[in-house]
Amino acid sequence: MLVNFILRCGLLLVTLSLAIAKHKQSSFTKSCYPRGTLSQAVDALYIKAAWLKATIPEDRIKNIRLLKKKTKKQFMKNCQFQEQLLSFFMEDVFGQLQLQGCKKIRFVEDFHSLRQKLSHCISCASSAREMKSITRMKRIFYRIGNKGIYKAISELDILLSWIKKLLESSQ
């Protein structure tokens, strides 16, 4: 009788695990916007980011990168990292940007909209603890002062390409 009970509990656990795994696998598609819509939003942001870069001083710090190759690996695999990186751009970078002019404000609004849409597509348990790579990035960003804003904005195309690859890899 005890063996029968243990087998039933085990079967129930296996069934629940499979159901949860299937839900997590399909969570991108069920509650998500059409990928074409997200991809078009990223393409539109590429164009607006190029315009935004043209309105700020050129990034002259060539020996420092905020978005490194290992950062890309984390972005592609870790949803908490994705959320923290997008928050860094929204709060730290755009929060310090002098938003004069409708186009700059519109860019930030569009970026925020994309961030919200992505958060609907990629379900992730939030973490109160900041990841080390984000902490390091913020330390560099604030250490170089206003030039940190120029650096981050000059690397927007890198971030947007990562978002595009993330969308493509989840198809």
UniProtKB/Swiss-Prot annotation:
How does this polypeptide assemble, per the annotation? Answer: Homodimer.
Q: Which organism is it from?
A: Homo sapiens
Q: Indicate the principal place this protein occupies in or around the cell.
A: secreted
Q: Give the classification, highest ranks.
A: Eukaryota, Metazoa, Chordata, Craniata, Vertebrata
Tissues where the protein occurs: Expressed in HVS transformed T-cells but not other T-cell lines or primary stimulated T-cells. Expressed in colonic T-cells including Th17 inflammatory T-cells; the expression is significantly increased in serum of patients with Crohn's disease (at protein level).
Q: What function does the entry list?
A: May play a role in local mechanisms of mucosal immunity and seems to have a pro-inflammatory function. May play a role in inflammatory bowel disease. Activates STAT1 and STAT3, MAPK1/3 (ERK1/2), JUN and AKT. Induces expression of SOCS3, TNF-alpha and IL-8, secretion of IL-8 and IL-10 and surface expression of ICAM1. Decreases proliferation of intestinal epithelial cells. Is inhibited by heparin.
The family assignment reads:
Belongs to the IL-10 family.
- Does the record bear Flavoprotein in its keywords? no
UniProt subcellular location: Secreted
The protein in question is named: Interleukin-26
One molecular function GO term is: cytokine activity
An individual GO BP term: cell-cell signaling
Question: What inducers act on this gene?
Answer: By Herpesvirus saimiri infection.
